[in-house]
Amino acid sequence: MSKVLIVHTRWYPESIEIMNHISIEILEKKYSFEKVAAPGAIELAALAKSKIIKNEYVGIIFNGIVIRGATSHYDLISNEAYRSIGSLAENFCDIAVINNVICVENEDQLKERLEKNTKNNTCLLYTSPSPRD
């Protein structure tokens, strides 16, 4: 059975658990999976890279949450997380890479997007053929 890597952040653990549960529920029908936790969104791509160099995965899904605060930290973290995940996708183009890092202004927006985005993004990974698959 082909294997998918689920890389998630440790921030907002209750919401991340929902995201991971949705991803696993969809993926386990077709794939085995490994789940690993990064300290935060900025470390997601580096952790994934360390794992995919050593193992064969057909896909990666990144589950994370960044909520805007009162400083520019949100902009720095969200931009760098997206840039590094995009760079990883370019460098490992034989693996399906799905970015499900949800960047929102507040918790109300998170509630609106959490389940829908995770289901939609995981389904993309589920249905995307990978050259490694």
What positions do the PLM features span?
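Active-site rim loops that border cofactor/substrate pockets in soluble metabolic enzymes
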Residues: 30-53
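Glycine-rich phosphate/diphosphate-binding loop of Rossmann-like nucleotide-binding domains
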Residues: 5-32
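Phosphate-binding/catalytic loops
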Residues: 104-122
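Conserved small/polar residues in nucleotide/adenosyl-binding loops
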Residues: 126-133
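Glycine-rich phosphate-binding loop
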Residues: 47-85, 89
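Short, ordered loop/turn segments at secondary-structure junctions
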Residues: 10-11, 65-66, 101-106
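Mobile beta-alpha loop/short-helix "lid" or hinge segments that flank ligand
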Residues: 92-109
